[in-house]
Design a protein with these regions (language model features):
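Periplasmic-binding protein-like
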Residues: 113-121, 141-143, 234-243, 260-262
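N-terminal export leaders
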Residues: 6-10
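Segments of small-molecule ligand-sensing domains
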Residues: 295-387
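Hydrophobic alpha-helical segments within soluble ligand-binding/sensing domains
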Residues: 155-177, 278-297
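Bacterial signal peptide processing site
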Residues: 25-29
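An alpha-beta-alpha
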Residues: 77, 164-212, 302-323
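Extracytoplasmic "Venus flytrap"
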Residues: 46-51, 55-76, 80-84, 91-102, ...
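Flexible loop/hinge segments that line or gate small-molecule binding clefts
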Residues: 133-157, 264-272
């Protein structure tokens, strides 16, 4: 299987989505970090007893073997164990739905004495807020949410940076000039990734156009397969996805096309089709957060990490990726790390011709967190949004 967001009501209104529909879709949403009043400091957390490890728990939306979103989180959990050794003891519960079950699992984790608890999907937010209020000495971390509390932080990854880099490769290698994206749920995170993929492709090949098929779920391999097949039948020779299984890449492999992995390295699922994987490495953030708790320096905040922090990368490039694309990827990575390059810098127009960023204007995180339009080159309309 994302990846922080502030103005949920505004964003849902912009997308024409009901809150209930979002919850029903399941999984993650990003929150664009923006300035906010810091919450009051939480009560001092109970330190581990002498010789006792820090107990850290993870609640996962999917199975650890999904090959994508949850797989990436669990790899980061393992990295925490490797980094800290006997200073920590980690546990996890997989396939926890975004329902009352989430509250039950989180509450059990707190009662079991876990001092740091990670919830790894957007829909856990109300449950984490409730449980955090009842366990003020426990630290909670919520992936892709936008609300915080004195003992609850929110964090996300800039997945659009990986999408842009995948676009660079796709734009350089397409033969049909038609690219396809299998999209999950029409929220700003996913729309932003589609657009960033398109912008990256256009930076190498202005003639490309991008088709999108929405499956309205995060993890549904049969639907993802159907969507990928439809895109290929529609002329797309390279596919990207913002869904959580390996079905899209596997379909590209089966039908003789190319594609990318998402969230985790998916090379093994389609070795001939695979061009690269836009991966999230949660381990830098998880190691940082555990260290903060161990040092007594943890504080509630909202963070959005990307290439600069080592959280996002495009890995396992295919051997036939041309040198021009490789060179451009290096420039982009270096620029993102230094802060000298901005993916969302004008002039940028939506696909109706309306200017959304003027010449030289750079999007801030609030803008990025509210995207509900397609850029030029993307066909069709955002479901419930603008053309």
């Amino acid at each position: 299987m994302i990846h922080p967001q502030k103005r949920l009501a505004l964003q849902l209104a912009a997308l024409g989505l009901a809150a209930a529909a979002l919850a029903a879709c399941g999984k993650k949403e990003e929150a664009a970090p923006a300035a906010q009043e810091p919450p009051p400091a939480p009560p001092a957390a109970a330190a581990p007893a002498p010789g006792e490890p820090l107990k850290v728990a993870f609640a996962y939306i999917g199975p650890v073997g999904d090959g994508g979103w949850t797989f990436a989180h669990d790899n980061a959990r393992k990295a925490v164990e490797k980094h800290f050794g006997d200073k920590v003891a980690t546990t996890f519960v997989e396939s926890v739905p975004e329902s009352a079950d989430a509250e039950r699992v989180l509450r059990d984790m707190a009662r079991q004495g876990n001092q740091l608890i990670f919830g790894t999907t957007f829909g856990y937010m109300p449950h984490m807020l409730k449980v955090a209020a009842d366990f003020p000495q426990t630290r909670f971390e919520h992936a892709t949410g936008y609300k915080t509390a004195p003992n609850l932080s929110a964090y996300d990854a800039r997945t659009y940076e990986g999408a842009y880099m995948a676009g660079i490769v796709a734009g350089a290698m397409t033969q049909s000039n038609t690219l396809g994206v299998v999209a999950s749920v029409p929220i700003p995170e996913v729309i932003r990734n589609i657009n960033s993929f398109t912008l990256g492709a256009q930076s190498m090949n202005p003639a490309v156009n991008v088709k999108v098929v929405w499956v309205n779920e995060w993890f549904n391999p049969p639907k993802e397969t159907e969507a990928a097949t439809a895109l290929i039948n529609g002329g797309a020779d390279i596919l990207m996805q913002n869904t959580d299984s390996s079905a899209v890449l596997q379909t590209a492999e089966k039908l003789g096309k190319r594609g990318f992995g998402w969230d985790s390295d998916m090379t093994s699922y389609g070795p001939k089709a695979h061009l690269g994987s836009a991966v999230i490495d949660w381990s830098p953030y998880y190691i940082h957060t555990v260290q903060q708790v161990l040092d007594g320096k943890w504080s509630s905040q909202r963070l959005w990490w990307g290439v600069k922090e080592g959280a996002i990368d495009l890995v396992s490039l295919a051997e036939d990726v041309p040198e021009a694309a490789r060179a451009r990827l290096k420039e982009v990575k270096d620029g993102l790390k230094s802060g000298e390059f901005h993916i969302w810098k004008g002039p940028i127009q939506d696909n109706s011709g309306k200017q959304v960023l003027a010449e030289g204007q750079t999007a801030d995180d609030a803008f990025l967190g509210g995207i509900n339009f397609y850029v030029q080159g993307v066909e069709g309309q955002v479901p419930g949004g603008t053309p």
